[in-house]
Amino acid sequence: MPFEPPATRNYKKHFSSHKANLDPIEGVWTEYAVGTLSEDGKVIQRKEIQKRASWIIIKNKGEYQVLNEYGEQNKFIASFTRTSQKNAYMFNAFYFESKDHIKVEAILVNGNRLEMAYDAPPGVFEENYREILDTIHIQDPDKKLTLHWQFNWLKSFPND
């Protein structure tokens, strides 16, 4: 059996004992992602990442807080809030180091899949992909790179 952090186990216990009162977005989620790197509008690389991360979503004072599998928010503060549309949420994230802010709509599909997509903000892109940027900028400093992320979060707990 794979290692499960104590925080994830504890949140699973919480979700189990409060299952009747949970909102559909609350639970443990596994992130899958497709990143598309473009240079001056042309795709140069596309990468699919299975099980990129594990997230815990729990209601906290009118919003849904996003925690990593250890129950922390160590690189960014993130949350979902309801919108006026059914099954639609606004994802908000603030990255500590780069000071970038992401705000994008996320759709809950069939109660067990969250879908969202956005271009990585410049600071987050540079922070995580500096070696790619350095290589390309040495070759041609005028080239413009963008990284578009498509995310699917699949609910792993609780299952209906």
Language-model region placement:
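Amphipathic/hydrophobic helical signal segments and adjacent flexible N-terminal regions
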Residues: M1-S38, E126-D160
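Central antiparallel beta-sheet cores of small beta-barrel/beta-sandwich binding domains
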Residues: F15-K19, D23-E26, T30-V109
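A charged, solvent-exposed segment within the mature domains of Sec-exported extracytoplasmic proteins
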Residues: K86-D160
